[in-house]
Swiss-Prot record:
Species annotation: Caulobacter vibrioides (strain NA1000 / CB15N)
One GO cellular component term noted in the UniProt record for this chain: chromosome
Gene3D superfamilies documented for this protein: 1.10.10.2830, 3.90.1530.30
Protein name in the entry: Chromosome-partitioning protein ParB
Role: Involved in chromosome partition. Localize to both poles of the predivisional cell following completion of DNA replication. Binds to the DNA origin of replication.
CDD domains reported for this sequence: SPO0J_N
Length: 304
């Protein structure tokens, strides 16, 4: 299977509230457009295909050849049925940058079209990123690493929280947290994810292993299911703990435990560790200052 890989993450900074869907975001833009002189905003129209530019910050970087070919065949027969969402190019006067619909634009070029329908919006960089993530995640067009990188950019560049992101895309906060953990996997394991040799479920199961590359190869060679992978990972040494007391290999936490740790950590603002021992276990909350301890005690006594 061949893929066309384009673009690299890296956004200009800006701040804007999340927690709303694509239609709400576009509705907000329509309510108060910042129209540049001579720009036609709102309705769709035909535009020469060569004046459209891809967005270098597009969350989706991989386009499967077979998907592009199928879409180009459909476009030859029926045309581009949905307008491509664009904004005025920030770099070149008279041209437009694609906000949503790059796959249609690429397929239209293959189909030999000279013009495509576009819909122009005035959007800032954060709105462009939000729309790109929402469109691709809701359509399952992003691979899991592209999805994780998009979340990382929103958090690091635009100071969004995992809860904000989860509300925007309609996923759980633990889904966002678990997806972002995959960025810590070695490059070789990440390449298996992109190629489809491993699923996100496989990758999450081995994320805490001391040697995820070896486990990944074993999973691929054995054709293991996610459940079989989780059982395999529980027997493997953990990355963080090394050897446990008595020289026994430490237990690998399952994805549910890791997600619960992340949820509690997000609520408390402190590092949280959960260790199961049969039907019992230990919940450890780590604080760095006495002020954090005092705040934790106050919150626990009055109810979080």
């Amino acid at each position: 299977m061949e893929s066309v890989v384009v673009g690299e993450p890296g956004m200009s900074e800006g701040r804007r509230g999340l927690g709303r869907g694509l239609s709400a975001l576009l509705g907000e833009v329509d309510a108060a457009p910042a129209q540049a002189p001579g720009e036609q905003l709102g309705g769709s129209r035909e535009a020469p295909i060569e004046i459209l530019q891809r967005n270098p910050d597009q969350p989706r970087r991989t386009f499967r050849e077979e998907d592009l070919e199928d879409l180009s065949n459909s476009i030859r027969e029926k045309g581009v049925l949905q307008p491509i969402l664009v904004r005025p190019s920030p770099d070149t006067a008279g041209e437009y940058q694609i906000v949503a619909g790059e796959r249609r634009w690429r397929a239209a070029q293959r189909a030999g079209l000279k013009t495509v329908p576009i819909m122009v919006r005035e959007l800032d960089d954060l709105a462009v990123l939000e729309i790109g993530i929402i469109e691709n995640v809701q359509r399952a067009d992003l691979n899991v690493l592209e999805e994780a990188l998009s979340y990382k950019v929103l958090m690091e560049k635009f100071e969004r929280t995992q809860e904000n992101i989860a509300q925007t895309i309609g996923k759980s906060r633990s889904h966002v947290a678990n997806t972002m953990r995959l960025l810590a996997l070695p490059d070789e394991v990440q390449s298996y994810l992109v190629s489809g040799e491993l699923t996100a479920g496989h990758a999450r199961a081995i994320a805490a292993a001391a040697d995820p590359v070896a486990l990944a190869k074993q999973i691929i060679e054995g054709g293991l299911s996610v459940r079989e992978t989780e059982a395999l990972a529980r027997k493997a040494p953990n990355l963080s703990a090394g050897k446990s007391k008595g020289g026994r290999p430490p237990r690998v936490k399952d994805t549910d435990t890791q997600a619960l740790e992340s949820d509690l950590s997000s609520v408390l603002g402190l590092d949280v560790s959960i260790d199961h021992r049969g039907s019992t276990g230990t919940l450890t909350i780590t604080y760095a200052t006495l002020e954090q301890l005092d705040d934790l005690c106050n919150r626990l006594t009055r109810g979080i």
